[in-house]
């Protein structure tokens, strides 16, 4: 079986190498304004990820409609085995590594694997890590997350290292949709330094300044979801801050 990096992941890596950071917009397929959000973000995001934590009923239709609106990569971010459609370009094939329930860290992805293969979807291997205050959000509740305390950033860094040893190429530090506060800069910094894995950071990022800080600290991808649902016009400023931080980060490396 060919486990080489696929087309979508290659494109993302090329942008990351050139621009220093990526901006993903998360769309919940059950939100009524999903088409409006897709229209607003199509000129600013690097990819659209589609997913939700609670029952999805119209994923095929939503994905088709979003792909009519934009040429951006449409990547699935499945909350369960029903979060997969052949209409997408790729799927974040993930393990919720710090769930208390083995269903979420192993059984669910295993049950979904054959469907992903039959659909011909590109699988992007990713560790999904629930960070404080995720227990107060839907994904924390549904996923039975043993959340990683913000004051213990070294725990997150070791999970990221473990993920890289398992062969995962991406790790998502998730504070949860609508979180009170985002993943700390320190946690991002030491997780990136120890593991070298591509870091996705989301949850509680409400301003361009905060997004800038996260990228400078080591985030490779910033995800916004609730923000763009409530204020789709905010994506332009978010993109500008993320890309500015990416350029500054690249300069600091040289």
Curated annotation (Swiss-Prot):
GO terms for molecular function: imidazoleglycerol-phosphate synthase activity; magnesium ion binding; phosphoglycerol geranylgeranyltransferase activity. It is found in: Cytoplasm. Sn-glycerol 1-phosphate binds at residues 172-178, 203-204, 225-226. Pathway: Membrane lipid metabolism; glycerophospholipid metabolism. It catalyses: sn-glycerol 1-phosphate + (2E,6E,10E)-geranylgeranyl diphosphate = sn-3-O-(geranylgeranyl)glycerol 1-phosphate + diphosphate. PANTHER family: GERANYLGERANYLGLYCERYL PHOSPHATE SYNTHASE, IMIDAZOLE GLYCEROL PHOSPHATE SYNTHASE SUBUNIT HISF/H IGP SYNTHASE SUBUNIT HISF/H. This is Geranylgeranylglyceryl phosphate synthase. It comes from Methanococcus vannielii (strain ATCC 35089 / DSM 1224 / JCM 13029 / OCM 148 / SB).
């Amino acid at each position: 079986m060919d486990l080489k990096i696929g087309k979508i992941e290659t494109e993302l890596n090329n942008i990351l190498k050139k621009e220093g950071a990526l901006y993903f917009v998360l769309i919940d397929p059950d939100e009524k304004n999903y088409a409006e959000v897709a229209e607003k973000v199509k000129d600013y995001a690097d990819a659209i990820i589609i997913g939700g934590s609670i029952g999805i009923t119209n994923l095929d239709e939503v994905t088709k409609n979003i792909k009519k609106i934009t040429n951006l990569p449409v990547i699935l971010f499945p909350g369960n085995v029903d979060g997969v459609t052949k209409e997408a370009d790729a799927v974040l094939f993930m393990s919720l590594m710090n769930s208390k329930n083995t269903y979420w860290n192993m059984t669910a992805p295993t049950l979904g694997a054959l469907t992903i293969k039959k659909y011909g979807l590109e699988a992007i291997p990713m560790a999904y890590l629930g960070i404080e205050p995720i227990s107060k959000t839907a994904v924390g509740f549904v996923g039975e997350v043993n959340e990683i305390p913000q004051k213990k950033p070294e725990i997150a860094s070791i999970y990221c290292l473990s993920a890289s040893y398992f062969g995962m190429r991406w790790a998502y530090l998730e504070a949860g949709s609508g979180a009170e506060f985002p993943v700390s800069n320190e946690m991002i910094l030491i997780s990136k330094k120890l593991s070298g894995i591509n870091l996705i950071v989301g949850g509680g990022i409400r301003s361009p300044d905060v997004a800038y800080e996260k990228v400078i600290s080591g985030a490779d991808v910033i995800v916004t979801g609730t923000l763009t649902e409530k204020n789709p016009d905010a994506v332009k400023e978010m993109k500008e801050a993320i890309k500015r931080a990416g350029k500054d980060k690249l300069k600091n490396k040289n």
